[in-house]
Amino acid sequence: MPITQYKAAAVTSEPCWFDLEAGVQKTISFINEAGQAGSKLIAFPEVWIPGYPYWMWKVTYQQSLPLLKSYRENSLPVDSEEMRRIRRAARDNHIYVSMGFSEIDHATLYLSQVLISPTGDVLNHRRKIKPTHVEKLVYGDGDGDTFLSVVDTDLGRLGQLNCWENMNPFLKSLNIAMGEQIHIAAWPVYPGKETLKYPDPATNVAEPASDIVTPAYALETATWTLAPFQRLSVEGLKKNTPAGMEPETDPSTYNGHARIYRPDGSLVVKPDKDFDGLLYVDIDLNESHLTKALGDFASGHYMRPDLIRLLVDTRRKELVTEADPDGGVATYSTRERLGLNRPLDPPKDERHGIVGVAGQKSAEQRKAGDL
């Protein structure tokens, strides 16, 4: 049975723009802070490391290239020592960590999320299935084995989605069908509605994302919904402006948009415009009972699977495949290829690929204090 009552935290802060190492250090600092406050879960925004490339919405492709190069150089491989440091921080603080980051794998960037357990294991590694609009100039698509969201934990069934994925009715239905109880609606950095100059979809500014999309997700799914958001400063505006262009001067429109909602869609907490830090909430999973009693969609008593069904394909689609010795096709999962099934800190012999009796004996001797 999961723990039904616990504290959780959502990050509303400015990323360390174009600086992988500083971003890792700030991430670990927040994990330490949340752990010391007694939180069992901390949620970071979309592409928290190295920040959301919001400049791509404001400049031409040619103007963006120097920023794009620096952004790629500071993106985070999921199988890197930097990620292992973040995983160790989760383990040291006995806390679940939901973190969005720009993942670089081979030569492609992905809008990725990980869910790290209190033992430092990566329980889920997912990639946004379809980058939004101009994001396609920076990121690639997720695959069949990297898009599932909901994981069974001792805090309940916890799910994560990135930005406009939280509006996707198919992903929402899938999460409901998987029994999601706690949801991380990870958002990037958004301008306020006062910045609009032309007729534009309402969801292209922060207020609807914070005050319409996110509570609608909470209500429709009956989940505790944490919506971490990035922030911007005057210095951040300068860093995100190509050379030769005048940066914006007022960052306030980008700030104050993080939210936490109850399973009935009611607001728990939102920050002031100048707040930078952690928003806390005391979660009680039993609060979802009445919302679920009225509307258990997708997999429960308020749906008709004999009439409406969702087809899901979680297979990885390979560009290159190899024939196996039995005449079939050899395949592998993204998790396996990136080493996410291996222990965080395996014994030295295992890290060098040596597995056998000698290695087992050495481990036993180390445990006994002989080495």
Swiss-Prot record:
Stretches with biased composition (Basic and acidic residues): 339-353
Expression induction: By cyanide.
GO MF, one annotated term: cyanide hydratase activity
Source organism superkingdom: Eukaryota
GO terms under biological process: cyanide catabolic process
Keywords for the protein's UniProt record, in alphabetical order: Hydrolase, Lyase
Short name of any one Pfam family annotated for the protein: CN_hydrolase
Entry keyword Transferase: no
Annotated EC: 4.2.1.66
Region (Disordered): 339-371
Transferase as UniProt keyword: no
Residue intervals of the CN hydrolase domain: 6-285
PROSITE patterns: CN_HYDROLASE, NITRIL_CHT_1, NITRIL_CHT_2
Catalytic activities: formamide = hydrogen cyanide + H2O
Active site residues according to the UniProt entry: E46, K128, C163
CDD domains for this protein: nitrilases_CHs
Record HAMAP family: CN_hydrolase
Role of this protein: Catalyzes the hydration of cyanide to formamide. Degradation of cyanide may be important for plant pathogenic fungi in infection of cyanogenic plants. Also acts on 2-cyanopyridine, fumaronitrile and benzonitrile, albeit at a lower rate.
Family: Belongs to the carbon-nitrogen hydrolase superfamily. Nitrilase family.
Assembly and binders: Oligomer of dimers, forming left-handed helical fibers.
Protein name: Cyanide hydratase
